[in-house]
């Protein structure tokens, strides 16, 4: 039944607070309606002035990191499924064919646009720290932080997985097919086998070389099929996972809660409790997990409205911070081949990361100055720090309106993860980023899937060197800060594009450069995705194979410090609507994905 909701006319479609609305200078009027809730932790929703469904001529599209996952989504769309139905299918297959990046043992963030009503809502399936978690659980006996390789393999790194419950919540509201239907492609593929891809083969080999697989996962991923296996399954070999099929069949038959009780839950708890460094995750923690349906964070950028995730993801805030800083410069006149264009993008990233590192965490438990961080006047003051000819020598966090005193946290997130976009025949859109965090997560393989190591996204230290409390410190029931940035963009009340990426901390930079490429530099989605990946959080990590060496040398002359990179794990996927109502898709050439349309 369609929800009846009231209307409220404001300057932009949504704001966290009145100060954010007042600060938005984009010359675009929007219509906002508060969206009512239907269970779960609902905060609100943006509502875009919806275009009538009859104006939608684009068919549908799936853009994801693996062809098998794309085909699963297309199968569900052809069967009359919604964007959310297809998202369930895509995620289920990604957990099988790309287990190093995401899966049902991890978490996700999903941004959804309902073309019929104009609702823009987000779903938070982030992992939660168990009740036994402590602020010092990633410190050794001397009080020093554990090294990341030690922490990531520990049971302490495993958070309560959220992706299955989140998909269940989204499906209850936006699913069109029975819950059991979207799981079928993954179940079939797990039972029959799928061909090992070059990327999966390479990453199994890399993990084996670093001795980074625990026995059960090693047995599954190696030719020998033993706990001491040493040979990755070769490219093209058929890999079956009947245990995963049984797990998915249970979820498909009994609903999302089947994952959080009974045999699956017991396997998860046993996996987290195993050595090395057993964790405290319990059956009670799993039973208590609830996803959240939250308002997006949205702001104007030139003639566009950009919407993303709110905390515990820092992605939405940081992407809007980058764009809000760049809005004070004529980026379109600079272009993607200019020194000035990259210089301003670097500086805006540096400013956004400094604020993000200091202030953003799980805002259920920590005060986060959401409105202040994206306030137009504040970002104008940050933009004033940018010189047209010299890189800033030092970048410190600013003092946005409402900011508390915090210690800086430079926690690094490993570039794992996966992102996909689905658009269905009615124009509904899903932009979803999903992860087990590091490659193969915590390396604990249970019930046919890998458990996450998401709790290593917390700061390992509860206070900084000055004794200031760190916002992203560990606490029981808390969600670790994320950089995941599933994003939707609108123009004149109509859906314009969806984009997102994996990449750890660098996700923010990848998404921002792609948005600038399309919105400022006039590039197609594929051209924008293909732009060099650059991450300016400390020394600028630049994808040297894709950027003009002369531009790099000129930027060095301005004071920028560089470190060579190879893309650093991006997997950008985007879909855009053209002026005549057709879909343009993009898949990151750095991975194995594709974007395919349904006529």
Q: What would you call each of these model-derived segments?
A:
Residues 1-12:
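Bacterial N-terminal signal peptides that target proteins for export
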Residues 28, 32-71, 75, 83-254, ...:
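Noncatalytic scaffold domains of N-terminal-nucleophile
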Residues 426, 477-479, 511, 520-567:
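Extended C-terminal subregions enriched in glycine
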Residues 96-100, 107-113, 117-122, 279-282, ...:
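Active-site rim segments in enzyme catalytic domains, especially the processed small/beta chain
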Residues 328-435, 444, 565-566:
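Internal maturation/activation junctions in enzymes
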Residues 76-77, 165-173, 254-261, 266, ...:
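Alpha-helical support elements that line or immediately flank enzyme active sites
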Residues 102, 107-114, 418-422, 486-488, ...:
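Short beta-strand scaffold segments in enzyme catalytic cores
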